[in-house]
Amino acid sequence: MIVIIYDGDSYGISKRIDYMLNSTTSSGKRTGILAIGAHPDDIELGCGASLSYYSNEKVYIISVVMTPGCCGAEYIDRHKESQEALNMLGCNKLIPLNFEDTRLYLQIKEMISSLEYIIENETPQDVEITRVYTMNNTDRHQDHIAVYQASMVACRYIPQILGYETPSTCLSFLPQVFESVDE
């Protein structure tokens, strides 16, 4: 299986991906991934195969879901379903946030603060986040665009930020990074 991921600056990135995630960091810490989604199921659908692969490689994974995802549909506990799915994919920690669904563009500053807090305070001391998976900048959903914008600011010191595609909202997604997740 191949997972397609967009990176705005992907020159020579394929070799760097495997190196960064199959070893400890230069500081001797365990490698970590931060996966960010606007709604429950965005992470699972957008980069779930990659997360599963890297969890098997003992990479520490934190997933952040910005909204409960309850607008426009009959209420179900989507955070609980997302927690179960992300646990099956091997995520070590899920942080469900409660920003207002379909209104994230009004909450970008608060999302940036939340993500910066999570990076600083929710990452174990022996883990260094070296990669972020987040929404991509060609998405048409207003919440996805807002999460992309907040992620780019909050994660500016993390060496690699990759955007993933979510079904039905990306009309012009042009992947530049491909990950092989075959075992």
Region spans (language model):
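Divalent metal-coordination and catalytic microenvironments
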Residues: D41, T67, S82, L94, ...
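Glycine-rich phosphate-binding loop and adjoining beta1-alpha1-beta2 segment
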Residues: G72-L89
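ATP-dependent adenylation/pyrophosphate-handling site
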Residues: G32-P40, E44-Y75
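A conserved beta-strand->alpha-helix junction
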Residues: L89-T102
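A structural preference for short, hydrophobic beta-strand core positions in alpha/beta folds
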Residues: S63, I95-L97, G163
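Short histidine/acidic/glycine/proline-rich micro-motifs that form metal-
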Residues: P68-A73, E100-L104, N136-H141
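Metal-dependent de-N-acetylase/amidase catalytic core
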Residues: I4-L34, L106-E183
